[in-house]
A protein has these predicted regions:
Chain A
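Conserved alpha-helix/loop element of class I SAM-dependent methyltransferases that forms part
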Residues: 6-22
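Class I SAM-dependent methyltransferase "Motif I" SAM/SAH-binding loop
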Residues: 29-31
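Glycine-rich SAM-binding Motif I of class I
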Residues: 33-37
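Class I SAM-dependent methyltransferase SAM/SAH-binding core
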Residues: 38-75
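Short conserved loop adjoining the S-adenosyl-L-methionine
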Residues: 75-81
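A short SAM/SAH-binding and catalytic strip from SAM-dependent methyltransferases
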Residues: 86-97
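S-adenosyl-L-methionine-dependent methyltransferase catalytic module, highlighting the catalytic core
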Residues: 100-108, 112-211, 215
Length: 219, 392
């Protein structure tokens, strides 16, 4: 991912803009902790990371961050409801199998969720498929078909539809093509998207869920 | 806006703390006594301890390092004329993760032990004979309460950190459970909130081995000679559980001590020779009754079910470390600690380090621990110094 002049990735900058000062933030799959560190230093956020890679955790601790080694799918279970103001799920949604479950869990432990993902319907991806007849490779989808960690291939329109269907309110959405913000025809022109989600009024779909029951009975 | 000051890396410039000496402090002198969890009390109690580095004028840089089952107060540096350094010398010293240029490091021998602190081999002042089995049962909480007296006498209100592996990790956890407001951070390594049946079973076999030795004489062997065979076997069992299948393969494989089998029951394999050597060495330096008491204290320890973090607001920061090949204190036990911390919204960092050394890793697998502990402490120290503690 490109780095802009002030040393922050454009997707990180968009997420940064969405976070209120002083907020409690959990980053699922925080990598080497650049975003969390930036939020802690410049938004006075109280931050916590979850990351699987041992070397990445070293980097986080080097930056003074608190990180727990866990995979995304099981890392949320122990957090009480409303532990965070924001749960960030950036560039890993497409690698997750239980997408709805994770988002619901994220909206249980956090009031809002910030989701960032690559757009599979980006114009160059469409062209690669339509004209080249090949699985698309773009800067935001940089993998060959045989070594991609991605298991979900979604477009911005797919995700918007998903949010309506599942009861997520889209509070904000920003779209990126490289360093450029996209406002017109994002599903065609954007390589990636950042969504700020919360539950739509009266939804809270997790209340009938067996996983949260398990968690609550344990408390 | 805060900026991150890049800390100096500990690697490279680390040195030894040099020649050190064990000191002694006596607490709970009559009419005082140390009240124990069992309901009994004991006093006076002597604690053997060592310190490294200098205490800040505001006494905010003290770190208490806690030893494992067979450890002692000698954590770093060298005793006069001694060849081997203290048990955690790799981690404690100038430029090392527990940087004695910056921190004041304390290590004390646990009560019930035999390395200078009051234990079953100490003389009972009321009878002028060794306590032996008259020694009251002590728990991990009792060990910690004795340490708290030591810290009190040193005039330290709040420790920057409590850290230790295995039973040392249990003590670190107990410190947070007993005195959360007195610990700024905790580093429990390769440890558990409670022993599993498997861990208790290994300890029980070790205890039975000691008690089955006729030389044990119900604990009254002082002046006669201790149950060396039983204690040696207990230690051999210990050493098997400290290693991993892979580390044993690498260290010994099926190599023979001599070229061929002897066709008798002498030690033929190198692994046998190693265990014999370890056992024989151990009986020279450790008291069998202490082994019984301390293993029991470990088995009784249980901070599961929400007892680690009680209802008081705890702002202790945690760094929890486990090792992949450690089957004696498996990673799931450390993860259980982390689960408790998450539930109570306590600031926690957790990492399972790659290592093939088994439980021994906490003493020998240095790279990951060095990086994590160095930076974790630095952040904790800076937070404390800046007075901007971690809001909850």
């Amino acid at each position: 991912m490109d780095i802009v002049a002030n040393g922050i990735r454009p997707d990180h900058q968009l997420i940064f803009n969405m976070v209120e000062p002083g907020a409690r933030v959990l980053d699922l799959g925080c990598g080497t902790g650049d975003l969390l560190h930036f939020l802690e230093a410049n938004k006075d956020a109280r931050v916590q990371g979850i990351e699987l890679d041992e070397r990445a955790i070293y980097e986080c601790v080097r930056k003074g961050l608190s990180v727990c080694q866990n995979d995304i799918e099981s890392g949320l279970a122990e957090y009480p409801d409303g532990s965070f103001d924001y749960v960030i799920l950036n560039q890993s949604l497409q690698e997750i199998r239980k997408v709805y479950f994770i988002l619901r869990e994220a909206l249980r432990v956090g009031s809002r969720v910030i989701v960032g993902f690559p757009n599979f319907a980006y114009v160059k991806a469409r062209m690669a498929l339509f004209f080249g007849g090949k699985a698309p490779m773009t800067p935001s989808l940089p993998y060959h078909w045989y070594d991609t960690p991605n298991v979900r291939f979604l477009s911005i329109s797919d995700f918007q539809e998903f949010c309506i269907e599942k009861g997520f309110a889209v509070e904000k959405a920003s779209f990126l093509c490289g360093q450029k913000r996209i406002t017109l025809w994002p599903n065609l022109r954007a390589m990636g998207a950042i969504f700020l989600l919360s539950w739509r009024e009266g939804q809270k779909g997790w209340s009938d869920d067996r996983f949260s029951h398990r968690w609550r009975s344990r408390r | 806006m805060k900026t991150e000051s890049s800390g100096t890396e500990p690697e490279g410039a680390s040195r030894s703390v040099g020649i050190v000496e064990t000191k002694y402090m006596t607490i709970a002198e009559p009419p005082q006594a140390l009240k124990l969890e069992s309901g009994e009390s004991i006093g006076p109690v002597t604690l053997a301890y060592e310190t490294y580095g200098a205490l800040d004028p505001d006494r905010s840089n003290a770190i208490l390092v806690l030893h494992a089952l067979s450890g002692d107060a000698h954590a770093a540096g060298y005793h006069q004329e001694a060849e081997a350094p203290g048990w955690w010398d790799a981690m404690i010293g100038p430029g090392k993760p527990f940087d004695t240029d910056r921190y004041f490091v304390i290590c004390s021998n646990v009560i019930g032990g035999c390395k200078g602190s009051t234990g079953p081999s100490s003389t009972n002042p009321w009878t002028a004979k060794p306590y032996a089995l008259e020694f009251p049962f002590v728990t991990i909480a009792d060990m910690v309460s004795a340490q708290r007296h030591l810290i009190d006498v040193m005039g330290i209100d709040r420790l920057l950190c409590v850290a230790g592996g295995s039973m040392g990790g249990m003590q670190a956890l107990q410190w947070v459970a007993s005195y959360p407001e007195r610990v700024r951070s905790a580093i429990p390594i390769a440890t558990a909130l409670k022993h599993s049946p498997q861990q208790i079973a290994f300890n029980e076999v070790s205890r039975q081995s000691i008690m089955a030795d006729p030389a044990w004489r119900n604990g009254n062997y002082y002046g006669i000679g201790q149950p060396e065979r039983g204690l040696a076997v207990a230690r051999m069992i210990g050493h098997i559980t400290f290693m991993s299948d892979q580390s044993m393969e690498e260290k010994f494989s099926r190599r023979l001590k001599k070229e061929r089998f002897s066709f008798n029951f002498d030690a033929n394999f190198e692994v046998e020779g190693y265990l014999h050597y370890r056992g024989a060495n151990f009986v020279k330096r450790f008291d069998a009754n202490s082994y019984l008491y301390i293993t029991k204290a470990m088995d009784y320890f249980d901070l599961s079910g929400g007892r680690l973090i009680n209802d008081r607001k705890v702002d202790t920061r945690f760094l929890v470390i486990s090792f992949k090949s450690d089957w004696l204190y498996p990673a799931y036990q450390s993860q259980e600690i982390v689960r408790q911390l998450k539930q109570k919204q306590v600031d926690a960092t957790y990492c399972e380090l790659k290592s093939t050394y088994g439980h021994d890793a906490f003493l020998v697998e240095l790279e990951g621990q060095t990086t994590l502990i160095h930076h974790f402490l630095e952040k904790t120290y800076r937070g404390e110094r800046n007075g901007n503690g971690y809001r909850r």
